[in-house]
Amino acid sequence: MELQLAIDLLNKEDAAELANKVKDYVDIVEIGTPIIYNEGLPAVKHMADNISNVKVLADMKIMDAADYEVSQAIKFGADVITILGVAEDASIKAAIEEAHKNNKQLLVDMIAVQDLEKRAKELDEMGADYIAVHTGYDLQAEGQSPLESLRTVKSVIKNSKVAVAGGIKPDTIKDIVAESPDLVIVGGGIANADDPVEAAKQCRAAIEGK
């Protein structure tokens, strides 16, 4: 089981500083969509240039022109790139092909997908590396969690890894870990903690069953 730190609300310098503080406890560091909107792909490059021994994910949330956008993210140092599960099949297939020919990985974000079971099966057959169930900020505010969606997707896929994101914190991560996802994505639960290093350490301990 892997742990990913999602960083959304910092500038690229502070993001790299935070990532380096917690890198002993995480496998993947994400440059979140808000940072990419604010600072562009150079934020991904800054992270890739300033951290070692962890993968860098660019949360592009691609919807179209997929092979080009994947290739650009890779050019700027991304190891993992995200595309939306609601994108056209042709876009997702092109994104997977572009990532794989560069020995990189593609994560498909299931935010706003209505028929999770059907789409997860399709994405699994397409060869997505990760299928991520994601309760976004707006639904978290309504009290929703990704647990049920995680169970649904895990029950139908055969090859892809299952990732889970959405309001996960050190004090709630054990409920998620109990469902055995392949990748647990924690954002504010680490980034906004009073002691991010301790929060990351607690999350790592939870996924290792300690």
From Swiss-Prot:
Documented EC number(s): 4.1.2.43
Record pathway: One-carbon metabolism; formaldehyde assimilation via RuMP pathway; D-fructose 6-phosphate from D-ribulose 5-phosphate and formaldehyde: step 1/2
Record keywords, A-Z: Carbohydrate metabolism, Lyase, One-carbon metabolism
One function term, GO molecular function aspect: hexulose-6-phosphate synthase activity
GO BP field: 'de novo' pyrimidine nucleobase biosynthetic process; formaldehyde assimilation via ribulose monophosphate cycle; L-ascorbic acid catabolic process; one-carbon metabolic process
Reactions performed catalytically: D-ribulose 5-phosphate + formaldehyde = D-arabino-hex-3-ulose 6-phosphate
Leader peptide range in chain numbering: none
CDD domains: KGPDC_HPS (cd04726)
Domain of life: Bacteria
UniProt KW Lyase keyword: yes
Top EC class of this enzyme: lyase
UniProt-listed Gene3D superfamilies: Aldolase class I
The keyword Thylakoid appears for this protein: no
Family: Belongs to the HPS/KGPDC family. HPS subfamily.
Function description: Catalyzes the condensation of ribulose 5-phosphate with formaldehyde to form 3-hexulose 6-phosphate.
PANTHER family on file: 3-KETO-L-GULONATE-6-PHOSPHATE DECARBOXYLASE SGBH-RELATED (PTHR35039:SF3)
Protein name from the UniProt record: 3-hexulose-6-phosphate synthase
